[in-house]
A protein has these predicted regions:
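Acyl-group handoff/entry surfaces in thioester-processing enzymes
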Residues: 57-61, 70-158, 167-263, 267, ...
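Short beta-strand-to-loop capping motifs
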Residues: 34-38, 111-115, 163-166, 214, ...
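Short, charged/polar, Gly/Pro-enriched secondary-structure boundary elements
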Residues: 40-43, 154-160
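A generic structural signal for beta-strand entry/edge sites
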Residues: 24-33, 144-148, 156, 205-209, ...
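DNA breakage-rejoining catalytic core of tyrosine-based enzymes
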Residues: 301-315
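His-Asp-centered acyl/peptidyl-transfer active-site segments
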Residues: 79, 99-107, 134-135, 144, ...
Length: 431
């Protein structure tokens, strides 16, 4: 029988989520809950979960207790001191100084709303979120030759409203696209602007389009989901003349940034760096794809999306293969992508950048802010491995990288000192 560590690791790789409910002291009396892909839930799967329930509950309870030890939690810090940027923020701030007036780091979102919209309550709800999350009323200035966060105690957002009701449907859609493009290309001033903008287009009395734009230095993909979810909750409550039902946040992003600076040093930093220096030793390859046009001397970030669909039959075959090999769909497709890149470049040493949410602490799960990190996943196709052999190598590399995801990409670049070329990302060319 597999050890509890091995068993739970296997479930994790199969995208099975486990949690414990109940306050009973006995492991047997607590409820073990799970969420898993439909194809994973078999009679054998359920039987083994029941058989190992007691040791699973005990293990998860011990992990939960260790996570919530008081000395390990992030604590609020005084706002009377200069507040440092997180490592990710500092890198983004530096890039902004190199290219002032850029809109490259804008995060856009567009939502079409149908039905009655109480605009005054909608605006009030937006401002409640800004009041709730300090990071949304934070600016970034240079003080004594280093950037710091400056939190405004009173920032108010005004919705930019445009009425398009006088246009026909075709003209409206063209105008929506044009205005959305203009909004996306409009830069923020990190030192002075509120780093969130909202534009409301009225198409009819019961149809609206909302543009929401944030600067990446205060937000990420996970944060946008939090924002939309909280907006819906608060707006619903306000429409019913009820106060916001959301609990007060125990910490803010600035607390995380200060904690990260203090925590990621000494032995912790050395342990993380040791892994990545070993994984990325030697000359790092440059993936030169056979593009139609010469590569620009400086990255312009001007690109396009190409979407395609995989048939249901092939999708099921991929799922079956991933289950057979004990890997997630992501890892299987990552291996396939690396093989495809090998085919087009002939390069055996393949590096791909992979973004991760980096929300591996309970207290930051509900915060808006710039937490995302990028992992550098390096694999080698030398020795003519079979697909299954290479797939297992990719799996090992990926999970090992997840175990060392606390080192910010910015810190990794700083310590590796890669040869810089403005036409390429410093460590990888495919993300």
């Amino acid at each position: 029988m597999k050890s509890i560590d091995e068993y739970l690791s296997e479930l994790y790789r199969l995208d099975v989520k486990l949690w414990v409910e109940g306050n009973a002291t006995s492991a047997q009396d607590k409820r073990l809950r799970f969420n898993a892909p439909e194809e994973i839930i078999t009679t054998e799967f359920i039987a083994e979960l029941k058989e190992r329930k007691s040791e699973i509950v005990t293990f998860l309870s011990e992990v939960q207790q260790s996570i919530h030890r008081p000395q390990e939690t992030i604590q609020p810090v005084s706002r009377q001191q200069d507040l440092s940027l997180s490592f990710a923020q500092q890198r983004l701030w530096f890039l902004e100084q190199l290219q002032p007036g850029t809109a490259t780091y804008n995060i856009p979102s567009a939502v079409r709303l149908k039905g009655e919209l109480k605009i005054d309550i909608f605006e009030k709800s937006l401002n409640e979120i800004i009041n709730r999350h300090e990071i949304l009323r934070t600016n970034f200035i240079l003080k004594k030759e280093r950037p710091i966060q400056v939190i405004s105690s009173d920032s108010s957002l005004k919705i930019n409203q445009l009425d398009l009701q006088n246009l026909d449907a075709k003209e409206q859609e063209a105008q929506v696209i044009q205005l959305m493009t203009q909004e996306l290309q409009k830069p923020f001033d990190l030192a002075q602007d509120l780093l969130i903008r909202v534009t409301l287009l009225k198409l009819s009395a019961t149809e609206f389009v909302v543009f929401l734009t944030m600067h990446h230095i205060v937000s990420d993909g996970w944060s946008m989901e939090i924002f939309i979810r909280e907006l819906a909750t608060i707006y619903t409550a306000y429409c019913q003349q009820q106060p916001s039902p959301l609990p007060q946040l125990s910490i803010q992003y600035a607390d995380f940034a200060m904690w990260q600076r203090e925590w990621l040093q000494g032995e912790v930093l050395e342990q993380q760096l040791s892994y990545w220096k070993n994984k990325l030793n030697g000359t790092l390859p440059i993936l030169q794809l056979p593009t139609d046009f010469p590569r620009a001397r400086i990255q312009t970030f001007q690109g396009a999306n190409q979407t395609f669909e995989i048939s249901k039959k092939i999708t099921e075959q991929i799922r079956t293969l991933s289950q057979t090999e004990g890997v997630t769909l992501f890892i299987l497709l990552l291996a396939v992508l690396k093989i495809l890149l090998y085919r087009y470049t002939g390069l055996e040493d393949i590096i791909i950048g992979s973004p991760v949410a980096n929300r591996n602490r309970k207290e930051i799960e509900g915060l808006i802010g710039f937490f995302i990190n990028t992992l550098v996943l390096r694999s080698n196709l030398s020795g003519n491995p079979t697909f299954r052999e290479f797939l297992q190598e990719v799996k090992t590399t990926t999970w090992s990288a997840y175990d060392h995801q606390d080192l910010p990409f910015e810190k990794l670049v700083e310590h590796l000192h890669p040869e810089r070329d403005l036409s390429y990302n410093p460590l990888f060319q495919v993300k």
